[in-house]
């Protein structure tokens, strides 16, 4: 059990380091009914992963492309791991959100039966794992995409080079 503590600390460290990335990603509207917004999401995802050594291929569909991201291992016969996530959110009614704009993420803490907005700066002062980030598509499904990025960056920081090919399919509908 004690051996897992450094990894838990690493997970918290890289989770917190990626909050600005999550905020940036959540700030891009992602209603698939608005193609121009979805192309901004495609651009952002492609740029963010290619900066980490992935190649990107647009797999055309009748509506929006699916993005195939690949990073090859040094061994050409290595096995492949495939991840999937989607980058669109359900249509949103801003009036139903208890914040100024669902595409401007906010940090909140539980206060009684409600959630109270607090400054993001508090994360660097006294992190509380019970705080939550509210923003359209934060848990379904942009947040998990950022968790994957954080994990990849944490692995790299340890000097680990995965011995498998990595593919990620990102759907925008």
Report each predicted region and the residues it spans.
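Acidic side chains
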Residues: 88, 140-141, 171-173
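Acidic/His- and Gly-rich active-site-bordering loop/insert found
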Residues: 3-138, 155-165
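Histidine/acidic-residue-rich, glycine-tolerant segments that coordinate divalent metal ions
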Residues: 163-173
């Amino acid at each position: 059990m004690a051996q897992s503590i450094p990894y838990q600390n690493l997970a918290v460290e890289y989770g917190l380091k990626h909050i600005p990335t999550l905020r940036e990603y959540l700030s891009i509207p992602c209603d698939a009914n608005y193609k121009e917004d979805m192309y901004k999401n495609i651009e952002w995802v492609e740029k963010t992963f290619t900066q980490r050594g992935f190649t990107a291929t647009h797999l055309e569909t009748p509506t929006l492309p699916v993005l195939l991201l690949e990073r090859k291992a040094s061994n050409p016969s290595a096995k492949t791991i495939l991840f999937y996530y989607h980058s669109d959110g359900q249509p949103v009614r801003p009036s139903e959100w208890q914040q100024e704009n669902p595409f401007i993420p906010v940090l909140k803490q539980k206060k009684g039966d409600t959630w109270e907005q607090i400054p993001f700066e508090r994360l660097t002062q006294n992190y509380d794992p019970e705080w939550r980030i509210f923003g359209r598509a934060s848990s379904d499904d942009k947040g998990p995409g950022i968790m994957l990025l954080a994990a990849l960056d944490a692995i790299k920081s340890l000097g680990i080079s995965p011995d498998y090919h990595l593919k990620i399919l990102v759907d925008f509908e």
